[in-house]
């Protein structure tokens, strides 16, 4: 029992009018003829309210509809009161237990075992109550306070403001909109007690007479005001008076607009802007040609980071473009020349890591650090840095200091770690404002300049022949509560963020403050934002970070809205199943297993782990791409290798077949389907369409493909063989059905010096060399915060490899050329890019299976057959791809009843005429195909004239 700090007599006085009745077996709450609050006197309101609030132990009460609230079930016979702790009028009503309606149990499955209570309030009364602090008090028969809970209100806000006609989710012009009269401002803030608008000039000084009171539309919860024409292109903020659970009091908060379209430096002020205005557009913006693809499966994605792309490029025409949007306007920088070469080979999509406004890079260049800044600037900005406590050369650059450190030492990681808070680097998964380009990538971050520069980048990529994909992060915000970079949670507290169902704490499973896209207005914000990027910035598709934390329905509805302005958009993302929403516990997720058949792509960890190896103990778990069975390292037993090998090979086969759930495999004299092959406790195959599957073996997360392999490779593998294993790993992605996703630099052996999570560790660990002279392997131990536990293993493998893991410029260039040839092979035939489940099942087969007569260890033989079904390739009737991951040249012999089937095949012309001298040793005989070690060879048979 919670002991009250005020006397029991006070409680008795409060409860004198309670009419107690016996509770039956149905465990209904004690009924009352009057509420506790009806007997309160005004002068006691504040003290009593404060006392109740001080005893609150959780936030387990959920107000779902105006007439229904739920609480965790209790065996105690208690009286529950919903109290509104408004100091002016302390109000309360008794809650009567009722059955939870089936439709609400289905809508809120994580609350389905809670007890429901009837709330006797009208819709208008409920709206008024939501503007105050709410608690539920539980009293026993002796009028003792047993429990006090705060109330979660997100669901009832949706019920009141989004489920009728012409309500909040149908308001089409939230934010600032320039119109004939001036500027319309609209902010959805249904729980706010008051909202006003403050305008600022270009110097961010408050404009005289620029504070305007806003009025609330009680039907929508939208506060609005019409300002004059002087507000056009002005900066602005909202002043919001709102009860905030973080402080448990009414706060007066100055906040930017969640629907901002332009911002000041460091996003401190929103700016009014019209994205149709010519001043926001580069020349010829409206007349540009946007590349298209015939089928979704024709896409090939190349994942870039705007700073990584050019920060290390020594061939820029202007050094100021380093790490900026402007670098994509270059014509002959090393990066642009490489992109042009990839485009010629068939690359058609540039995927940009987050480019919306983020909170973790200071946009004022004078206040952030660049790797080429001097130590003098370092010590001026952050004087407590350890290097500043020593004798140092003020003119020496950060880069040159890092270069002076021993590569096997800890100094580089220590310096980078100390400076990361102040440098100009971050991946960008720290959303501040969802619908404004990030300012740190612009030469001028203030106002419309960043908008123009972003559009120039998109326009230039389109002109190079690329579609542009944007990485978006609607699953969390950088901050919430009353923190400086909180926006949404200051306007409608505890609505936009997903809360723990009992504690009310903001869930953090994504990394940060999770958003609740199951809430209608959070889903609307996501959708409205996506439409702006697609319509006004001509973004051609979107990759969704931690998409599995969002409802499937919200994703489908967002795609429908984006398709209305861009019919050939494509959505894909991370469909991982984890956290508080795992296994559809709160809603049907946009996860791998749920999105089958939707043509929203999900990253496949199945093919990835088959190739890279899995597990946390990296050296103990090899993959097919780094020596499993055929180049076993000292940690892996022979039996483990054999067992892992057969499973990994079948997982890879399903991956090559688009990860289809229903793809048939003949295995051990029986036929199984893709969904029957295990991947841990889940099926390997889950896709119902090839567009459901994104294949990859490397991306920004985790170690690069090169670094991952060095962790796992046997020590005696030669440098040349390491490069071949690397390019063969990429071949699985490029020759698979589904859509390939390629990490920038993976084609030329990119390393991050073993760093598994480089999100905020600067240019030193994230460098890319498009001149192909260096892959930046082993440039210092990775930062301790991420990899200290791996340091002993890193030192062990570096010593064991004895330099065989160090590549030359020739290795880097050779890898890049082989990659381009494999990419060109993929794009040479639609047989690699089949567009339906039916066509894959018809045309794709594997000619050797584990435990079959045709099995040869180390060989995987895939046949793409255009002699069945509709013709998709005018050039080739059949393609056979042989992946030889063994250490020896091997021959695949066809079955005896098809002895002449190899006649008419030849090595693909691109490989015949390419730079890989090893693959050219592949041979075709009447009875089969001979392929060198560590080689992916493609054999083609020309299409018959009558086909």
Where are these regions (language model features)?
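C-terminal beta-strand-rich structural cap/linker in extracellular carbohydrate-active enzymes
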Residues: 189, 233-236, 921-947
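C-terminal motif of bacterial Sec signal peptides marking the signal peptidase cleavage site
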Residues: 20-22
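Substrate-binding/active-site clefts of carbohydrate-active enzymes
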Residues: 307-312, 316-319, 326, 341-348, ...
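Short proline/glycine-enriched turn/loop motifs at strand-loop junctions of beta-rich domains
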Residues: 72-78, 189-194, 886-888
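Active-site-proximal helices and loops of the catalytic beta/alpha 8
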Residues: 204-206, 210-217, 369-372, 535-540, ...
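Bacterial signal peptide processing site
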Residues: 24-26
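The feature marks proteins involved in alpha-glucan
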Residues: 30-32, 36-59, 103-184, 220-224, ...
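Loop/helix patches that line or flank the sugar-binding groove of alpha-linked glycan CAZymes
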Residues: 677-681, 685-880, 885-892, 899-901
């Amino acid at each position: 029992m919670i002991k009250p700090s005020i006397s029991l007599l006070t409680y008795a006085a409060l409860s004198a009018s309670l009419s107690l009745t016996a509770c039956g077996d149905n465990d209904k709450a004690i009924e009352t003829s009057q509420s506790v609050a009806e007997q309160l006197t005004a002068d006691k309101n504040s003290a009593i309210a404060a006392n109740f609030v001080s005893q609150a132990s959780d936030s387990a009460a959920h107000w779902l509809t105006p007439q229904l609230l739920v609480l965790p079930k209790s065996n105690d016979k208690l009286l529950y009161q919903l109290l509104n702790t408004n100091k002016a009028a302390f109000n309360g009503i008794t809650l009567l237990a009722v059955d939870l309606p089936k439709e609400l149990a289905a809508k809120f499955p994580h609350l389905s075992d809670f007890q429901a209570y009837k709330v006797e309030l009208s819709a208008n009364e409920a709206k008024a109550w939501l503007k105050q602090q709410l608690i539920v008090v539980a009293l026993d028969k002796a009028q003792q306070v047993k429990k006090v809970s705060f109330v979660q209100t997100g669901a009832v806000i949706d019920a009141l403001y989004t489920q009728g006609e012409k309500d909040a989710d149908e308001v089409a012009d939230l934010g600032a909109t320039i119109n004939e009269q001036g500027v319309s401002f609209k902010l959805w803030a249904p729980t706010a007690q008051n909202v006003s608008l403050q305008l600022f000039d270009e110097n961010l000084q408050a404009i005289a007479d620029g504070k305007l009171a806003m009025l609330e539309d009680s039907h929508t919860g939208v506060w609005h005001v019409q300002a004059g024409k002087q507000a056009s292109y002005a900066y602005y903020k909202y002043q919001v008076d709102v009860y905030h659970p973080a402080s448990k009091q009414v706060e007066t908060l100055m906040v930017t607009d969640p629907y901002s379209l332009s911002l000041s430096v460091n996003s401190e002020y929103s700016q009014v802007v019209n994205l149709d205005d010519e001043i926001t557009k580069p020349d010829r913006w409206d007349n540009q040609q946007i590349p298209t693809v015939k089928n979704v499966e024709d896409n090939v994605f190349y994942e870039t980071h705007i700073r990584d792309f050019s920060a290390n490029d020594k061939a820029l025409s202007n050094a100021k473009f380093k790490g900026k949007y402007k670098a994509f306007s270059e014509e002959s920088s090393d990066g642009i020349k490489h992109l042009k070469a990839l485009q010629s080979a068939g690359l058609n999509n540039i995927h940009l890591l987050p480019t919306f406004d983020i909170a973790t890079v200071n946009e004022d260049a004078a206040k952030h650090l660049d790797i080429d800044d001097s130590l003098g600037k370092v010590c001026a900005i952050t004087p407590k840095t350890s290097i500043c406590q020593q004798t140092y050369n003020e003119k020496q650059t950060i880069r040159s200091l890092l270069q002076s450190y021993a590569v096997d030492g800890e100094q580089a990681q220590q310096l980078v770690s100390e400076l990361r808070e102040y440098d100009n680097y971050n991946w960008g998964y720290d959303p501040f404002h969802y619908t404004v380009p990030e300012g740190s990538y612009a030469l001028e971050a203030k106002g419309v300049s960043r908008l123009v520069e972003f559009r120039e980048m998109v326009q230039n990529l389109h002109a190079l022949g690329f579609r542009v994909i944007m990485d978006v992060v609607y699953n969390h915000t950088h901050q919430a509560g009353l923190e400086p970079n909180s926006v949404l949670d200051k306007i409608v507290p505890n609505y936009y963020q997903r809360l723990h169902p009992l504690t009310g704490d903001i869930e953090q499973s994504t990394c940060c403050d999770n958003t609740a896209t199951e809430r209608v207005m959070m889903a609307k914000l996501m959708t409205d934002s996506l439409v702006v990027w697609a319509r006004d910035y001509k973004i051609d598709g979107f990759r969704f970070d931690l998409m599995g934390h969002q409802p499937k329905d919200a994703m489908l509805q967002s795609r429908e809205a984006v398709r209305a302005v861009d019919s050939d958009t494509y959505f894909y993302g991370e469909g991982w199943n984890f956290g508080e929403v795992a296994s559809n516990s709160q809603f049907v997720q946009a996860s791998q297993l749920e999105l089958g058949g939707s043509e929203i792509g999900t990253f496949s960890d199945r093919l990835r782990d088959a190739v890279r190896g899995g597990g946390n103990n990296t050296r103990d778990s090899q993959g097919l791409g780094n020596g499993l069975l055929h180049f076993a390292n000292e940690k892996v037993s022979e039996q483990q290798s054999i067992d892992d090998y057969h499973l990994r090979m079948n997982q890879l086969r399903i991956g090559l077949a688009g990860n289809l759930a229903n793809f048939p495999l003949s295995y051990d004299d029986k036929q199984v389907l893709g969904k029957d092959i295990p991947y841990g406790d889940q099926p390997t195959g889950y896709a119902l369409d090839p567009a459901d599957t994104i294949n990859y073996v490397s991306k920004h997360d985790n170690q690069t493909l090169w670094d991952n392999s060095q962790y796992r490779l046997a020590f005696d593998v030669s440098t040349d063989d390491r490069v071949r294993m690397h390019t063969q790993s990429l071949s699985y992605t490029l020759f698979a059905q589904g859509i390939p996703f390629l990490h920038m630099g993976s084609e030329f052996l990119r390393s991050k010096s073993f760093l598994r999570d480089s999100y905020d560790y600067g240019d030193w660990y994230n460098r890319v060399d498009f001149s192909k002279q260096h892959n930046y392997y082993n440039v210092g131990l990775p930062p301790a915060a991420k990899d200290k536990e791996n340091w002993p293993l890193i030192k062990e493998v570096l010593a064991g490899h004895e330099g065989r893991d160090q590549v030359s410029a020739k290795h880097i260039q050779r890898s890049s050329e082989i990659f381009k040839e494999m990419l060109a092979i993929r794009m040479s035939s639609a047989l690699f890019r089949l567009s339906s489940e039916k066509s894959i099942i018809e045309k794709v087969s594997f000619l050797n299976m584990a435990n079959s007569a045709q099995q040869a260890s180390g060989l995987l033989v895939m046949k793409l057959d255009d002699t069945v079904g509709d013709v998709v390739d005018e050039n080739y009737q059949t393609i056979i791809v042989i992946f030889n991951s063994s250490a020896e040249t091997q021959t695949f012999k066809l079955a005896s009843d098809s002895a002449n089937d190899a006649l008419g095949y030849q090595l693909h012309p691109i490989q015949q005429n390419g730079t890989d001298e090893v693959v050219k040793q592949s041979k075709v005989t009447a009875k089969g195909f001979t392929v060198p070690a560590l080689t992916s060879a493609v054999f083609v048979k020309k299409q018959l004239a009558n086909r």
